[in-house]
Amino acid sequence: MAAIGVHLGCTSACVAVYKDGRAGVVANDAGDRVTPAVVAYSENEEIVGLAAKQSRIRNISNTVMKVKQILGRSSNDPQAQKYITESKCLVIEKNGKLRYEIDTGEETRFVNPEDVVRLIFSKMKETAHSVLGSDANDVVITVPFDFGEKQKNALGEAARAAGFNVLRLIHEPSAALLAYGIGQDSPNGKSNILVFKLGGTSLSLSVMEVNSGIYRVLSTNTDDNIGGAHFTETLAQYLASEFQRSFKHDVKGNARAMMKLMNSAEVAKHSLSTLGSANCFLDSLYEGQDFDCNVSRARFELLCSPLFNKCIEAIRGLLDQSGFTADDINKVVLCGGSSRIPKLQQLIKDLFPAVELLNSIPPDEVIPIGAAIEAGILIGKENLLVEDSLMIECSARDILVKGVDESGASRFTVLFPSGTPLPARRQHTLQAPGSISSVCLELYESDGKNSAKEETKFAQVVLQDLDKKENGLRDILAVLTMKRDGSLHVTCTDQETGKCEAISIEVAS
């Protein structure tokens, strides 16, 4: 039996396969183990991956990047609004949904984010099939801990449209622990693990408890203001300043020149993880002027020191939030391509001097490898080396029901607080006037991170054709069951008549 694990990040995607008891990442047709999560549209074709990324300088308005940031979001979502402002590919609202406006000259197309993700998933499936054959379509897909129900559903919809059979969605930190087999080396012991993920656009931190081979998420936090792109941007700004110093031309306002500098800065950043210096040469950067600049690792570290400090302060903040000290952490797992940066690794080691830093698996491969292992567990574990891992996921957001108070104002009741271990079951009694013939239970979610949090409706259950009563109230019992993958089953029952309605919000099948 064979299965697939896929990790879709904001800037890149990676696919791993489980076969013959082992999991490993598969290189794409260009020989790269990580594929840019970029889709470019031309008059006759849709281009995915490195070729799309390389062509964006001349086709920027029809090139979609960072689609994960807008997937499953509405136009009034603050993160979607930020994305729309920054996107070089025009995003509009059409028929109540966000669409990319693609103009290739012959026609104008309106493409939804799910279709973009479908193309990326199709590329991942094609890559997996190169080693497994076309019959292997079972997949486990990773999601950030703070993904909401609508985002999970949109991701699952795109995966199924690409031809995948989605076995489960699992949280990224859980996949990272699976990749290292944490819990198998000391199945009867208890340990606390910090998962440090520095991706392309954000820093995600999680504290996980492993006890007798069982995983539990204790606390988590994401900072969208620190990511690999911010390190690249910092270096690109330095290169622009050096160009201005040498040639008296300020190119910081020139989009084409800055895109070239960003490309060069990204290559240099990668090189500086293994080399002491990197050369940035750009042919005809601006007005026919070539640019050649050597950047040392020491210079890069100095430029990015504020970003390094933010990463370390974020770790300290999460430890405080968890009620832990650095001494309470037993291992640190590194994920995300930018966690390769040597200076960052040294700062983390300094914070946890007695702790094992796990980075033997390439950081941008560890999450899809864990997903492939989970897929192997699900399709049959008789040959799997990591046989007994059991993840206990927890709810990423507050799940609430909406009611009204005595004054008629909206009142929300939290049934599943963020961090509730899954699976879990809750009951809620909704009282409604007996004179009405239908009752609606509305379900909301909230990130619960601050006092100004906003509740977002994601589902409702309507109990109709109820017998009216002249006096009194009727009691409606709502039973909500959330499974380990975050899918939710809701049953509403009229306690007097037994009339019942139910819905299921599936996120992984």
From Swiss-Prot:
<comment type="similarity">
    <text>Belongs to the heat shock protein 70 family.</text>
</comment>
<comment type="subunit">
    <text>Component of ribosome-associated complex (RAC), a heterodimer composed of Hsp70/DnaK-type chaperone HSPA14 and Hsp40/DnaJ-type chaperone DNAJC2.</text>
</comment>
<dbReference type="InterPro" id="IPR042049">
    <property type="entry name" value="HSPA14_NBD"/>
</dbReference>
<dbReference type="GO" id="GO:0005524">
    <property type="term" value="F:ATP binding"/>
</dbReference>
<dbReference type="Pfam" id="PF00012">
    <property type="entry name" value="HSP70"/>
</dbReference>
<dbReference type="InterPro" id="IPR043129">
    <property type="entry name" value="ATPase_NBD"/>
</dbReference>
<dbReference type="GO" id="GO:0005829">
    <property type="term" value="C:cytosol"/>
</dbReference>
<keyword id="KW-0143">Chaperone</keyword>
<dbReference type="GO" id="GO:0005840">
    <property type="term" value="C:ribosome"/>
</dbReference>
<dbReference type="InterPro" id="IPR018181">
    <property type="entry name" value="Heat_shock_70_CS"/>
</dbReference>
<keyword id="KW-0547">Nucleotide-binding</keyword>
<dbReference type="GO" id="GO:0140662">
    <property type="term" value="F:ATP-dependent protein folding chaperone"/>
</dbReference>
<dbReference type="InterPro" id="IPR013126">
    <property type="entry name" value="Hsp_70_fam"/>
</dbReference>
<dbReference type="InterPro" id="IPR029047">
    <property type="entry name" value="HSP70_peptide-bd_sf"/>
</dbReference>
<keyword id="KW-0067">ATP-binding</keyword>
<protein>
    <recommendedName>
        <fullName>Heat shock 70 kDa protein 14</fullName>
    </recommendedName>
</protein>
<comment type="function">
    <text>Component of the ribosome-associated complex (RAC), a complex involved in folding or maintaining nascent polypeptides in a folding-competent state. In the RAC complex, binds to the nascent polypeptide chain, while DNAJC2 stimulates its ATPase activity.</text>
</comment>
<keyword id="KW-0963">Cytoplasm</keyword>
